Amino acid sequence: MGFDRDSLNYAAVIGSGMGGVFFGSREPTFWIINAISQASPLPVITSFFLLYALLGVSFKTAAIVKLSPKPLLSIYFYMTLYFVAHEFTQIRTGVAAGIYLFALHSLSRGARGEFLLRLLAATCFHYSAVVGLVMFLVPGATRARLRLFALPIIGIGLGQILTAENFEAVGTYLLPGPIQGRLFLYLELLSDERFSQINLLNPVTTSFLVLYWILVLKIPSTARIYDRYLLSSFGIGIASYYACSMIP
């Protein structure tokens, strides 16, 4: 507790009840894990974070062992880059990301129905996983390095063009209720000066950008379709980060 602001927000929500609009503000699995935590002999908050951490670590470890050609190296990068962020702070994202790794593998095998089911499971842990549908538009066997290299640049360009009104229109007409509510909440935070001072070219995001470009240049022509999907997903994630930079 107190590791970051998210943990304090979760503590305020846990045990506050279910129903109405407040229930829709979180995914179904959030309330299921909350209910299990209430019945646990351990302190509620301890059980809550422990259950999410166990799920996140289990899904990602299973995906690494099954899908990575170099599992030890993959586990090293997971522990150094994502473990704290996913299993200590962004706990819902952490579980959804683990399931998403399996979903992409389904898509790489051409099993689109299985991909949708697994993506639905990921969305039940974090609504934002629904954006994974964009991977349907990505040719699995693409070798267009220039196109992949340009993704972050396109995102940066869009970030200079898009306005709060654009995002509000998308939220109003295209997004389902729960995701729409979160978007509008973030748009309201634009009035907070703390968020206007965020440096998009901070060392962490810049290091991810540089790493992505290195991978684009170095990926072999014989790389697995699954690896190409992972790289494309990485690039789309970075592009989305820059394109939506005006949202806190």
Task: Say what each PLM segment does.
Residues 41-55:
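Loop-to-helix entry region of an early transmembrane alpha helix in multi-pass inner-membrane enzymes
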Residues 10-11, 28-31, 142-248:
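Alpha-helical transmembrane segments and terminal signal-anchor/GPI-anchor hydrophobic tails
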